[in-house]
């Protein structure tokens, strides 16, 4: 905690998630953004990219100005700007950044992310799945966080959508096995026109005019945050030409028989109780753009799901894969700070 009583955070990587985490942080009273690092973006360009957003609209909360080449002003609040390629060299200690959001997509394992600790940070939250850092999904397993753990992963946006839904269903009815499909909006790694993508040939095809089948580790990752479901879920993705908001289709076999109405009631109860603000519930005739700017991780679409029998059901849940996820990154930091 800083002298202001606020949690001081830094952001490494000012891409989609980095900028939106900054937006979330700057609208909250319990967080203070003290520094941003990105070696590829100048300070004046940073200001422009923060201010104007094709999906989430122009920033309306306060003026954003460049004080000098190393400082941005958000209203009266000055934020230090760095351009270090090596995270070890970012002066987090000097600006007092206790928690660093690692959102470059590059330093996603414990060894690489630990460079921020050497630079003076106390904790690191990786805004991506990690092969070896413990993964936490707020609303699902964040209570298992121990204060001596310094590097954590906030999992993926899709895992954050799927896990709360899977938790409710497994707790109430038991999941024998399940398959997930996410119909997922385009992301920065995709191509505007056909281009080279050696690891994933389909992923190199033009994002704006194709439905592109893709792999995702999101369903398997649920088994890491909910060990009871380990080995019971897997899934895949279709990348589609929408700029933001995605939707999970979870098809599961249940241990206990349940009508679709009983399943809806269980999800609705949790959305108003333990998972309020994380899991949503709607019976409206919604479409994807209705969820742009929705800060919840997962919004269950009661009308869209369907049961084949009392043991076999398809469940549909929406998520703003940018804004909802960025909101959870900040929530996880607040939770971690509360356990210190």
Curated annotation (Swiss-Prot):
The keyword Cell inner membrane does not apply. GO terms for cellular component: cytosol. GO terms for molecular function: glyceraldehyde-3-phosphate dehydrogenase (NAD+) (phosphorylating) activity; NAD binding; NADP binding. The record marks 184 as: Activates thiol group during catalysis. It is an enzyme of class 1 (oxidoreductase). InterPro entries: GlycerAld/Erythrose_P_DH, GlycerAld_3-P_DH_AS, GlycerAld_3-P_DH_cat, GlycerAld_3-P_DH_NAD(P)-bd, Glyceraldehyde-3-P_DH_1, NAD(P)-bd_dom_sf. CDD domains: GAPDH_I_C, GAPDH_I_N. PROSITE patterns: GAPDH. Signal peptide: none annotated. Keywords: Cytoplasm, Glycolysis, NAD, Oxidoreductase. D-glyceraldehyde 3-phosphate binds at residues 156-158, 187, 216-217, 239. One of its GO terms (biological process) is glycolytic process. NAD(+) binds at residues 16-17, 38, 85, 321. Pathway: Carbohydrate degradation; glycolysis; pyruvate from D-glyceraldehyde 3-phosphate: step 1/5. The active site is at residue 157. The keyword Nucleus does not apply. Its EC number is 1.2.1.12. Pfam families: Gp_dh_C (PF02800), Gp_dh_N (PF00044). It is found in: Cytoplasm. It catalyses: D-glyceraldehyde 3-phosphate + phosphate + NAD(+) = (2R)-3-phospho-glyceroyl phosphate + NADH + H(+). Key enzyme in glycolysis that catalyzes the first step of the pathway by converting D-glyceraldehyde 3-phosphate (G3P) into 3-phospho-D-glyceroyl phosphate. Essential for the maintenance of cellular ATP levels and carbohydrate metabolism. Plants contain two types of GAPDH: cytosolic forms which participate in glycolysis and chloroplast forms which participate in photosynthesis. All the forms are encoded by distinct genes. PANTHER family: GLYCERALDEHYDE 3-PHOSPHATE DEHYDROGENASE (PTHR10836), GLYCERALDEHYDE-3-PHOSPHATE DEHYDROGENASE GAPC1, CYTOSOLIC-RELATED (PTHR10836:SF112). Homotetramer. Belongs to the glyceraldehyde-3-phosphate dehydrogenase family. This is Glyceraldehyde-3-phosphate dehydrogenase, cytosolic. It comes from Pinus sylvestris.
